[in-house]
A protein has these predicted regions:
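Tryptophan-anchored aromatic micro-motifs
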Residues: 55-67
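Sequence-level preference for short, compositionally simple segments enriched
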Residues: 40-42, 80, 86, 165, ...
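Sec-dependent bacterial lipoprotein signal peptides
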Residues: 2-33
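Glycine-rich, aromatic-bearing surface loops/beta-hairpins
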Residues: 164-215
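A charged, solvent-exposed segment within the mature domains of Sec-exported extracytoplasmic proteins
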Residues: 135-186
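Low-complexity, acidic/polar, glycine-enriched regions of mature
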Residues: 54, 74-75, 79, 91, ...
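Bacterial Sec signal peptide processing site at the extreme N-terminus
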Residues: 30-50
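Central antiparallel beta-sheet cores of small beta-barrel/beta-sandwich binding domains
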Residues: 64, 68-154
Length: 215
């Protein structure tokens, strides 16, 4: 897998530094209180269309996304070209990013379908160079939820943040991604992404990643 550019994390690292004091105070105030789960993915079993992760991301697709801080302020925008190659139950997904400040970055996910549990949830595991350990989660209905820790470089130290990542398929060619970013169990921001694939993306792919659009 290709190694994601370290500079890609600098913006999120700066945000975490700004939030660190607030987070520390809140963490002390909330010490001993367990965070509640966001939702039970099993409750989405009847939602349609059914998401098959490796099939949705096989081939060429594009995405548009934003990052907001915990107060809902827009901090960054980005666009992505994606290319997925499917080999049995394994998907290798290449992502190429352009951010609105001109920064370029890349990530390669290796995603394995592990099987289906007795509850009907299809289990997945994903690995990428900048993800600590492996992303773990499941799919049912039109939704996937997986969680993972990403290590960010800050002042020469590695700082872990947690991602609670949800994907909801809307129709054959559209899915919406919401990822909640937290530190010490306290949410510090969120990512929203719209994925476009298939015929809907045919007139868009590849997006220009030379520079951010000016008009």
């Amino acid at each position: 897998m290709r190694r994601t550019h370290r500079r890609k994390h600098s913006w999120l690292g700066r945000l975490i530094v700004k939030c660190f004091v607030v987070v520390s105070v809140l963490a002390g105030a909330l010490f001993g209180i367990s965070a509640c789960a966001r939702k039970d993915i099993g409750a989405l079993s009847g939602n349609q269309p059914r998401l098959v992760l490796e099939e949705f991301f096989a081939g060429k697709s594009v995405a548009y996304g934003i990052f907001e801080d915990r107060f809902g302020n827009l901090r960054r925008q980005f666009r992505v070209n994606l290319n997925g190659n499917l080999d049995g139950n394994r998907l290798v997904l290449d992502e190429e990013f352009l951010y609105d400040d001109g920064e370029r970055a890349s990530r390669t996910w290796t995603i394995d379908r592990l099987g289906t549990g007795t509850n009907g949830i299809v289990m997945y595991q994903g690995r990428a160079a900048d993800v600590a350990m492996a992303a773990q989660g499941g799919q049912i209905g039109n939704a996937l939820n997986w969680q993972y820790d990403m290590t960010l470089e800050m002042s020469g130290m590695g700082v872990d943040v947690h991602f609670d990542d949800w994907i909801y398929q809307q129709d054959e060619d559209i899915a919406i991604n919401r990822a909640y970013v937290s530190k010490f169990g306290i949410e510090i921001g969120s990512v929203t992404i719209v994925f476009i694939r298939g015929d809907t993306a045919s007139d868009l792919w590849p997006l220009s990643l030379d520079q951010w659009p000016n008009s």
